[in-house]
Amino acid sequence: MKCPFCGDPNTQVADTRENEGGEVVRRRRRCPKCDKRFTTYERIDLKMPHIVKRNGNRSEFEHDKLAGSMKLALRKRPVTLEALDAAVDRIEAKLLALGEQEVPSEKVGELVMRELKKLDKVAYIRFASVYRNFADVDEFAEVIREVKARPKRNRPAEPPEPTSENDLFRS
C-alpha cells in the first residue's frame, strides 16, 4: 500500500488485529522510506440495496443516515452507542438477507421502528410520529396506547443507571 506521507509504494505491515466479530481487520503499517506509521482498515464490501423513496426516486443506502435518524430518536434516552450500533447492524443484515437490489423506504422504516421498539419505547414513539406523519393527536395517542398495552417483560422498577460514557442521553 502506498504511504500517505511520502508516496512510497512499499509499506510494511507492523501489526494486524481483527475486531471481536471478525468483520474488520486493523493494520498498522510503516513506511521504510520516511519511517512514518499509519493505520488501515480492511472490511468486507457488501453491496447494500438501493432505497426506493415514496416519490419513486432511488438513492444509495446510507449507513450514517440510518444511524443518525435512530440516534436522533434515542437522544437523551438511556441507550448506549453499542446498543444503537447493534440495532443498525441487525437492520443492515436484514436488508442484505432480502437479496434484493432495491428496497422501498417503507421497509427500512418498518425495520427501524421494530428495532427502536425493542430498544426504547419513547424513541419508538418519537420515530413513529415523524415516520408515520400523524395527522392529529388521536393517531399519536393510539400509538402510545398500543405501546402501553404490550406486556412488559422483565422490566426493572426504575430505569437503569447509565453505565457508559457512550450513553446517548449525554450528547
Curated annotation (Swiss-Prot):
Gene Ontology BP annotations: negative regulation of DNA-templated transcription
NCBIfam families: transcriptional regulator NrdR (TIGR00244)
Function, in words: Negatively regulates transcription of bacterial ribonucleotide reductase nrd genes and operons by binding to NrdR-boxes.
Organism: Aromatoleum aromaticum (strain DSM 19018 / LMG 30748 / EbN1)
ATP-cone domain: residues covered: 49-139
Stretches for region Disordered: 148-171
UniProt entry tagged with the keyword Ligase: no
ZnF unnamed: positions: 3-34
Domain of life of the source: Bacteria
Cofactor annotation: Zn(2+)
Keywords tagged on the record: ATP-binding, DNA-binding, Metal-binding, Nucleotide-binding, Repressor, Transcription, Transcription regulation, Zinc, Zinc-finger
Cofactor note: Binds 1 zinc ion.
ATP-binding among keywords: yes
HAMAP family in the cross-refs: NrdR
Family per similarity comment: Belongs to the NrdR family.
GO molecular function, one term: DNA binding
PANTHER family named among the record's database cross-references: TRANSCRIPTIONAL REPRESSOR NRDR
Identification of the protein by name: Transcriptional repressor NrdR
